[in-house]
C-alpha cells in the first residue's frame, strides 16, 4: 500500500510539473513578439483563382510561405463569436479580447456596413502572429484578397507599414465574361447565393473600381506583377512560381 501511495504521489507530482512546464512554454510563446515579416499581397477579382494559386505555392515551396485569406479570416472570426455565444464561454481576458474583434466584425456585417480597414488589418496581423507561432516561425506571408482599396492601403501602412515589408503585389487579371462563366459554374455546386449573374457582375465592377489605387500605387513602386489568369491553373502557376522565385533573389 505504501509503495502504491508513493507511486501515486510521484505520478501526481510529475503530472503537475508537466502542466507547469507546458503553461510556462505556452506563456513564453504567447509573449514572443513576431519579427518583421516579408509580405506578398495577392489581388484579383472573384473567380480568378488567386486562392488556388496561393495554395499551390505553399505546397510547392514546402511551407516556406503561409497563405492567409482575408475572407476566410473574417468568416472564421465571425464563427468564433457565434460558437462562444452558444457555449457562453468567454471568461479569460485573451478570449474576451479575441471575441471583441469578432463582435465588431459581426456588428458591421449585420448592420450592412463594410468592415473597417483598421479591423481587417488587425485581423490579418493576428492571423500572421498565430501562424508564426504554429508554423515553424514562418515569416513569409501571402495575403490573399488584400488590399482591396485605398482604405486598406492606408490602414496597413499605419498599423503594419513600419514593421513588415511588402515585396510584391500579384494581380490576377481575367476578362469579365470568363469570370462570369467560372462563377456560374461554381454556383451550380457551391450553393452560394452570390454566384448569380447580377451579383457576379456587380462584384467584378466593384473590384475593378476599388483596386485602381492599389494597382497604381504598387505599379509606380515597381512591386506590381500582372498575371494572366485566363489560362489553365498549371500555366498560371508556372508564371506565379517564377515571379516568387525572382522576388527571393
Q: How would you label these PLM feature ranges?
A:
Residues 1-249:
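Glycine-rich phosphate-binding loop of ATP-dependent small-molecule kinases
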Amino acid at each position: 500500500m505504501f509503495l502504491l501511495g508513493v507511486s501515486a504521489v510521484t505520478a501526481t507530482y510529475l503530472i503537475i510539473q508537466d502542466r507547469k512546464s507546458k503553461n510556462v512554454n505556452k506563456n513564453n510563446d504567447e509573449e514572443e513578439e513576431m519579427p518583421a515579416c516579408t509580405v506578398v499581397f495577392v489581388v484579383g477579382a472573384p473567380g480568378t483563382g488567386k486562392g488556388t494559386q496561393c495554395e499551390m505555392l505553399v505546397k510547392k515551396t514546402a511551407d516556406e510561405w503561409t497563405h492567409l485569406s482575408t475572407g476566410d479570416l473574417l468568416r472564421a472570426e465571425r464563427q468564433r463569436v457565434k460558437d462562444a455565444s452558444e457555449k457562453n464561454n468567454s471568461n479569460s481576458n485573451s478570449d474576451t479580447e479575441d471575441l471583441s474583434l469578432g463582435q465588431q466584425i459581426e456588428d458591421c456585417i449585420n448592420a450592412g456596413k463594410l468592415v473597417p480597414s483598421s479591423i481587417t488589418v488587425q485581423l490579418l496581423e493576428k492571423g500572421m502572429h498565430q501562424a508564426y507561432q504554429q508554423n515553424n516561425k514562418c515569416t513569409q506571408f501571402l495575403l490573399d484578397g488584400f488590399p482591396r482599396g485605398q482604405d486598406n492601403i492606408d490602414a496597413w501602412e499605419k498599423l503594419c507599414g513600419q514593421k513588415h515589408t511588402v515585396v510584391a503585389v500579384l494581380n490576377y487579371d481575367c476578362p469579365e465574361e470568363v469570370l462570369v462563366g467560372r462563377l456560374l459554374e461554381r454556383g451550380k455546386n457551391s450553393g452560394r447565393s452570390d454566384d448569380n449573374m447580377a451579383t457576379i457582375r456587380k462584384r467584378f465592377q466593384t473590384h475593378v473600381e476599388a483596386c485602381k489605387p492599389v494597382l497604381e500605387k504598387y505599379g509606380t513602386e515597381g512591386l506590381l506583377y500582372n498575371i494572366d489568369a485566363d489560362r489553365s491553373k498549371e500555366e498560371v502557376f508556372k508564371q506565379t512560381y517564377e515571379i516568387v522565385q525572382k522576388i527571393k533573389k
